[in-house]
């Protein structure tokens, strides 16, 4: 009962608990800025290793919050988070591709919105599996590195990098 001196309702409490993971997930969206990136994003192993570490950190730091967000958000204002995030990421990637095309005219950006959408859905599948299964850190590192390599190779092929 005293907690409601600080929060107006259960949903506000829930959102406050999940705020750190939400901030990190949205930071991933906003990191897609063509003005700040080069074509090497598709070929640079250092960038790929950074991506691997970001996912490891996300799951390691927020496993419980991710579980709540992905599996226990029904009835809250975050129950549609996955689809809202997927839509936001799809729009952001589309704009990112347009910016990259301006910098690198030879790039093929004629990729369907649905494929971009599906790529974000795969991200949630990856996060769900890592949250549900207690994968050892070494295995997680290898698995995420494989995922990033697979994803990067696919984008390189589709975009004619």
Language-model-detected regions and their locations in the chain:
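Solvent-exposed, amphipathic alpha-helical segments
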Residues: 24-35, 65, 122-130
């Amino acid at each position: 009962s005293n907690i409601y001196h600080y929060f107006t309702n259960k949903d506000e409490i829930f959102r406050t608990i999940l705020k750190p993971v939400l901030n990190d997930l949205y930071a991933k969206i906003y990191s897609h800025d063509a003005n700040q990136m080069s074509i090497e994003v598709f070929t640079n192993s250092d960038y790929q290793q950074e991506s691997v570490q970001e996912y490891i950190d996300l799951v390691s730091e927020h496993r419980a919050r991710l579980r709540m967000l992905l599996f226990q958000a029904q009835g809250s204002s975050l129950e549609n988070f996955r689809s809202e995030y997927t839509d936001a990421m799809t729009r952001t990637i589309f704009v990112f591709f347009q910016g990259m095309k301006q910098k690198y005219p030879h790039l093929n950006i004629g990729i369907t919105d649905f494929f971009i959408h599906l790529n974000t859905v795969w991200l949630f599948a990856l996060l769900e599996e890592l949250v549900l299964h207690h994968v050892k850190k070494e295995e997680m590192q290898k698995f995420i590195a494989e995922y990033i390599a697979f994803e990067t190779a696919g984008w390189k092929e589709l975009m004619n990098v």
